[in-house]
């Protein structure tokens, strides 16, 4: 039985993010890396998350924290609403909303992630959290106001 990819692509997982998470392939661009990292959170794969963090971030030190977070967090969906990169600059950005429940409460991470390419491989380096007014349109594209959607 085929399983749709948790990244929201509407493609079978084995044909979408699995080749990246399993190490068969390297993500070709920041958007694919972002989507595969989301899948790693869903699948509780700390090794892939650490491997795809930029080496300067010292992600291995976060292993215990990541694993502890897996026990309390259920990921509900990912919406990528903006992505841009240039291989010439070796830098890229992906803006997304990741919805989750933790401790019985629903939440959302809204982030503009920054990625760096080194030696032919993209890495997550950091992200910023844009600020939205309660009456602004939600960045997830639902058409609702932020306060009635991801801002709850």
Curated annotation (Swiss-Prot):
Stored Gene3D superfamilies: 3.10.450.50
One family name in Pfam for this protein: YchJ_M-like
Domain of life: Bacteria
Entry-linked InterPro entries: NTF2-like_dom_sf, SEC_C_motif, UPF0225, YchJ-like_M
The family this protein is said to belong to: Belongs to the UPF0225 family.
Alphabetized HAMAP family for the sequence: UPF0225
Protein's name in the database: UPF0225 protein YchJ
């Amino acid at each position: 039985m085929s399983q749709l990819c948790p990244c929201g692509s509407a493609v079978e997982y084995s044909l979408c993010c699995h080749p990246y998470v399993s190490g068969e392939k390297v993500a070709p661009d920041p958007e694919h890396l972002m989507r595969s990292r989301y899948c790693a959170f869903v699948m509780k794969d700390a090794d892939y998350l650490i491997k795809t963090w930029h080496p300067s971030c010292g992600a291995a030190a976060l292993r215990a924290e990541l694993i502890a977070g897996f026990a309390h967090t259920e990921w509900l969906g990912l919406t990528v609403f903006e992505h841009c990169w240039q291989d010439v600059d070796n830098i890229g950005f992906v803006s997304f909303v990741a919805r989750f429940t933790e401790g019985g409460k629903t939440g959302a991470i809204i982030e503009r992630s920054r990625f760096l390419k080194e030696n032919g491989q993209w890495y997550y380096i950091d992200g910023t959290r844009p600020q939205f007014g309660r009456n602004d349109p939600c960045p997830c594209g639902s058409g609702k106001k932020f306060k009635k959607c991801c801002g709850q």
